[in-house]
Amino acid sequence: MRSPRTFTFYFLLLVICSSEAALSTPTEPIVQPSILQEHELAGEELLRPKRAAAAGDRVAEEYMVDIEISFENVSFLESIRAHLNNLSFPIRGTEADILNIAMTTVCTPAGNDLLCFCEKGYQWSEERCLHSLTCQDYDSALPGGYCSCLKGLPPQGPFCQLPEAFITLKLKVRLNIGFQEDLKNTSSALYRSYKTDLERAFRAGYRTLPGFRSVTVTQFTKGSVVVNYVVRVTSAPLPGSIHKANEQVIQNLNHTYKMDYNSFQGTPSNETKFTVIPEFIFEGDNVTLECETEFVTSNTSWYYGEKRSDIQNSDKYSIHTTVINNISLITRLTIYNFTQHDAGMYGCNVTLDIFEYGTVRKLDVTPIRILAKEERKVVCDNHPISLNCCSENIANWSSIEWKQEGKISILGNPESDLESSCSTYTLKADGTQCPSGSSGTTVIYTCEFVSAYGARGSKNIAVTFTSVANLTITRDPISVSEGQSFSITCLSDVSSFDEVYWNTSAGIKIHPRFYTMRRYQDGAESVLMVKTSTREWNGTYHCIFRYKNSYSIATKDVTVHPLPLVSDIMMDPLEASGLCTSSHQFKCCVEEDAGEEYAVTFHVDSSSFPAEREVIGKQACYTYSLPANLPRCPKDIAVFCHFTNAANSSVRSPSMKLKLIPRENVTCQDPIIGIGDPGKVIQKLCQFSGVYGSPGQAIGGTVTYKCVGTQWKEESRACISAPINGLLQVAKALIKSPTQDQKLPTYLRDLSVSAGKEEQDIRSSPGSLGAIISILDLLSTVPTQVNSEMMRDILATINVILDKSALNSWEKLLQQQSNQSSQFLHSVERFSQALQLGDSTPPFLAHPNVQMKSMVIKRGHPQIYQQQFIFKDSDLWGDVAIDECQLGNLQPDSSIVTVAFPTLKAILAQDVQRKTSSNSLVMTTTVSHNIVKPFRISMTFKNNHRSGGKPQCVFWNFSLANNTGGWDSSGCSVEDDGRDNRDRVFCKCNHLTSFSILMSPDSPDPGSLLKILLDIISYIGLGFSIVSLAACLVVEAMVWKSVTKNRTSYMRHICIVNIAFCLLIADIWFIVAGAIHDGRYPLNETACVAATFFIHFFYLSVFFWMLTLGLMLFYRLIFILHDASKSTQKAIAFSLGYGCPLIISSITVGVTQPQEVYMRKNACWLNWEDTRALLAFAIPALIIVVVNVSITVVVITKILRPSIGDKPGKQEKSSLFQISKSIGVLTPLLGLTWGFGLATVIQGSNAVFHIIFTLLNAFQGLFILLFGCLWDQKVQEALLHKFSLSRWSSQHSKSTSIGSSTPVFSMSSPISRRFNNLFGKTGTYNVSTPETTSSSLENSSSAYSLLN
């Protein structure tokens, strides 16, 4: 028996040979099984054309041949599959080619049966499925879908076939008979009868359609009887074929069904293909819509929008129809320059017989999105810079173009990648293309994307070209000596740059506070300025202008020659007494410098003498001996030493004083201290007193001696140990160093280590203690940020000096320098404000004598700040809290730092020790950023005095006691926390201000009796003023017609009304400002600026209206023959009264507010300390007072000595005289008011000036009502006339007729006479300006404590 492989080979060879033989012989016997099936379905007429063609011109035809292969071994199946897959097609023959061989059907035995499966992609025909037994019917467990497998091979083809693409025609027709309900039931006999008859008729009629396959009735509905059915065909109907088929249906259907021929309706589905080109539409594209059908017709159309507007050929649209092979049709609509307005629904209609083919598509415009950096800066240094453009859109781009527009033309090299939708334009500009004159010129480069369909999208890139800066630096060599100043000027010819800085030769940046920078239109300038040079400034310095990655550098060498500073020269003696018959030695010592020897001379009177040099330890000492037997005695001699270095720079020491006395006056004598008479007090440097170590050590400080009896007694000692003194000298040099911020961390570490080693000396020596305080004060002024490690070193040093064992040294130190404790606290607060925690965890730093806690404010995550401090050794505790609302007003990333001290209370303000004082913590809380709004803080202290006394919450005010500092209770109060616990005191603090701040830059001490008195006067006076001014305006309104009958009276009352109105508004704004900065409402910066502006404006308006009144009087008396109209006078008056104040107040706020120095930090009034903006109010007011006084003198003189012919009418003279009275009284009052205001400016002025100033200003409104309004005789008469009864009128007439009745406020009344005698018959009182009496808390500490 042959092997399977041999059998397979012979079989395939047979297939191929048989195929080739078949292609050379008549084909009819071989293809018969295949074409018989075709003949049965489609009719004989379809086969004949093929045969005619084959027998005629031998035109190439395609045949499908079914070959059946049988074999016994199932494993052959995979071998056949593999062999067929490896064949290469086509297989060429002499007269025919085999195009493809595909396996379609596989039958395998299953018991006694044969199961036939379709290969993937093939299926049994519907006819076979309906009339054959499927595998699932044989065994439901077999895999595969229904009808993918048949039981038994069909007796006569076809086998499995490729699935046909059917066209389903949905139709309906009406039967003109009555509808019966059984037609809804698919299992009823009536339904089956109708379905069978109709399908038979439909099949007979529609089988004439090309590619007909089946027809099925799907439903019967009402409307007579409406028959719904579907016809399945493989090709589109030909025109007119449906009508013919419908006629055949009518003919083949029983007439009893009464089918209505005109009721045939139909709509096909899935037969129209709609294409949009391009897929993504950009604005400007030419868009083509294609509608393709599988049939041919001439009835096509296009429409747009929901209203189905018909589209015709035009400039915008083009419609074109194409027939392909006479079997399909494509209609195209082209839309030119598609815009956003063209977007919407588009549809095509193709009509064939009773069918309407069509589809709809919505078209949208996609914006062209181009990514590019819109601004670039390019330095003309010949380095390539790339401009990049990329489109986010996936599109068929035809090109990417670059264009430029600008004053200068700099071309680049474009490179585009259309597949990635990106383009790069590389610029390489050099100095010749952008000279210095064109530096900063901007050129617009445009990248434009062009699609294959016409759309264009562009993006502009603004490129600013900057020339490389040419730097010019100070030419002259810089050679200075220590202590001298120098500056280096660096000029750039380019004004565009990103950064300017200075470097040392080691690459260390110099702190910006040492240099300035100014930018000009055509360049820039930076100046390095050093006020006090040290040896650390010796070296090379680089001026660097950076623009992007381009650097322009200029260098300058600086030579600093050593020269001792005056403060570094140690002298002996400072002052001394000596015998006339003895020689006396003078000594000047400086730190020994190996590289420099000074020429030193001693100067006595007008003579100079060379010095002798001696090195003692680390010091170089220069001495001179004054010879004995001077001609005159006693005599006072002043001696100083003069140092000259190699650069011929010199410095002289302070004078050493020697008093020559006879021997008989000497009672005290010591070889080191010297001689002296009783009561003599002298100072010696500790270095030369022999009280500290060896003479060569750099010991600081002084010792004071007093001659008592025959012995020198040491009165006080303020010596500084050598290590601490060395640190002090380094600290003084560090704050002048160019690299101070880099050196500060190392220095603070060394300071804490040295403080620990010298702990005993610091706590026992006031001098060393004072040196540490001076060091901390110096270092706290270094403008740099403090980190946690630096703060740790600072607190370690503070812990040493605040120990209880150092309290005696503190007391002695404060007796010598009373501000040292306040200075120490101030330096701690500066360090706390400079602390920057960043993202690190806030540290808790704890020592026995100081603790620190902190928090960082995060954006969007406000939380309560609450910290507690416990000092068990001191039996003290306290906590501080700031609520979430207050923290929300802080800038993000602000640091809040609280430092607590258990012993500082006993050190601060020694005068407190003389009172009953509560021993409590001192807690200082600082914020790293400026606080714009008032800040409320609450604290709780342990109460160690529960038995008696009233606790008082206080804060440290640095400005008290001539800036020595003191405890202040302003804005702090003891509150009830609801716990009823006498062991604790709950405090709330909110800084307040008082009213006298308006004119005086300084203010009375908060909480003092003077401050309270000024507050009371201000509030009462303002209340009276507001009521009086309102009453004045009401009175003027009532008597207006009676008192304004001539122009002079009219203008006078215009001025009085405006004065009263302006002062009333000013007083109201004054109260608003007081409410803001008194803390009743949060201090809003905008509200405070507004209050300051309106107070300034309306108070100035009061004075300018007063000036208007004076000038009007002057005009009426001097220019008698010139009479201006009312409208002219009013225009001038209002321009002067409101225009000038508006200009002054607007300029003031415009100039100062951008720098945030318009108003004070703690009050709503003009700034004094920073900008002297207060002068914008005081100077105009005082000038107006002087002018009005001068006018008053002239007017009174003119009235008393009238010229002939110049006398005005009686009524005019009465008005003028009344005005002179008003000016005469009002102006002196104003002058006195602001005279006292000037007095309050003087530092330490008497409290009487504050009281008088506040009294006169607060009651101005009342004075205006009395003297400016009610004292006017015409006003009195008008009021009496308006409110008198007939009886009173009769009596008044009678009294008037006999001349014995006078109004109570008339010039001749007794009361008026008293005023006339008092004021010299000059009239009424004029308007002054109220002052805020606010206490300045700008120098207040944030340290709080508790007083009892």
UniProtKB/Swiss-Prot annotation:
The modification Phosphoserine is found at S818, S1309. Residues 268-366, 367-464, 469-559 form the Ig-like domain. The record marks R51, A52, G223, S224, L992, T993 as: Cleavage. InterPro entries: Adhesion_GPCR, GAIN_B, GAIN_dom_N, GAIN_dom_sf, GPCR_2-like_7TM, GPCR_2_Ig-hepta-like_rcpt, GPCR_2_secretin-like, GPCR_2_secretin-like_CS. Disruption phenotype: Knockout mice are born at the expected Mendelian rate. They are viable and fertile, but display labored breathing by 4 months of age, weigh up to 25% less than wild-type littermates by 14 months and have a shortened lifespan. They exhibit abnormal bronchoalveolar lavage fluid, reminiscent of pulmonary alveolar proteinosis. This alteration of surfactant quality temporally precedes a massive accumulation of foamy macrophages, leading to severe pulmonary emphysema in aged animals. In addition, knockout mice show impairment of the blood-brain barrier. Adhesion G protein-coupled receptor. In alveolar type II (ATII or AT2) cells, required for normal lung surfactant homeostasis. Modulation of both surfactant secretion and uptake by ATII cells is mediated by the downstream activation of GNAQ/GNA11 proteins and may be a consequence of increased cortical F-actin assembly induced by ADGRF5 activation. In the kidney, may play a role in the regulation of acid excretion into the primary urine, possibly by regulating the surface expression of V-ATPase proton pump. This is Adhesion G protein-coupled receptor F5. It comes from Mus musculus.
